[in-house]
């Protein structure tokens, strides 16, 4: 501040002297003659005297200003009559000496004559120089003192023959109030040469308002100023809050209190730093008017390390000394009224009510469950404590399960509820396994089916049901005892693909079918001609079918006997064929006793030949 004030005084004296320069002749060095050593010594003497008087004047004015003009920091405001009686005389005396020395210096070397002839650099007074460009202001506060750095770009001097060495800059500075009104007269804070485009203003109040502008000067008679820029100096960075302490603890909360920082301006907020014993941390912002806070949503029975810092608009203070606090221990009670409200084959819907209120927070609930064989144990968790219902899925039908509910804090589980035993609903059996079909008899063709029971019967099986017939044709249905794992078909058509579908049934119903196909071989059959069937009454008044046929006359069609297949005629095919075998190749008729005399019957007669000794009628079961 002192150096800038001396520059201000010198600038003012230069300005008062330059008005007389136009009446003087050319300076040394501009009349065609080089300067002598004596001329250099004379100028040097004047400069030393100016500096000496300026420093003396600066000390006097600075001391007085500290008493009377306290808009700068580090000063003590006083009454206007606090100056000593000879202050004005001392200032005038030194100003007179400075003005004399300056006038002598300008007489020997005028910087910028106002006009004339005979080698003067400016035949006329130069026009106003343009103002500096891109004026920028930055402010910072360190400790309890603020500073402002002003920077600018050199103006574009175009269209005039101006020596840039004659260019100077003036930095103007004035205090403002918070509403932007100027509270004191602007002063020239710094005078800079043409190559100096940065100036600093120091020893300012933090969080104070100022106005700064920069002017361009040529020959001290021509000046253009930039637009004024307003700024607020940053606040001081506060010291750390003191005496951080605990007011109280609960399972999920800690009450804190602290004292104000010893060094502070206007605070923006406090920040509380919290780190738990497992290393996780979080921060809490607190209003600057408060010196206490309550930390919520903590984990019970957990140690926390806590510190606090203060913020101004200029940054954060150091953190306070940390303290270690442990929240209270809390174990919740058991959930109440735990019950099942819905069940189906694979899921159970459970509900409950929260435990009796305690001192701590419940975070979530869990359901532990297993089947009656304790083969596997499972756990279901609710997302939060607001949910007091659970739908347990993926269960097995017709199975007994045990369920138990627990309330959880952030650290531990409470007491378990009463255990609930619940059976899931029964469902139909799964598909019979490893269904296999093979030839059981070749003439007439029959199939033999074998299988294994379903993997899941869900109770006892009532029976099996097989649906079979020519593929994509009419089907027949038969029931099979639940203890049997084998079944023989009725006589089948030659050279035809048959389809068999096997279902298992429990008390719930039929499950899905296992399917297998079997194709009968193509055979060369012998059918006797002119087959006839008559219905008659026998000796005991029973109904008999008299079947007759003519002899087989085709060459090479010798038979060993005849087989007669017969069954009652039905629109819906339900019954099986009956077989009567006549081992006489010369037979021409046969009598068959039947029931249900009111039904019509279907009769098929075929000749057969006995197999040769090397023929296998029933090949062995594959893999057996």
Curated annotation (Swiss-Prot):
Residues 131-236, 240-330, 334-430, 431-524, 527-624 form the Fibronectin type-III domain. Keywords: Repeat, Secreted, Signal. Its main location: secreted. It is found in: Secreted. It comes from Margaritifera margaritifera (Freshwater pearl mussel). Coiled coil: none annotated. One of its GO terms (cellular component) is extracellular region. Residues 1-19 form the signal peptide. This is Fibronectin type III domain-containing protein 2. Prismatic layer of shell (at protein level). SMART domains: FN3. InterPro entries: ECM_Regulatory_Proteins, FN3_dom, FN3_sf, Ig-like_fold.
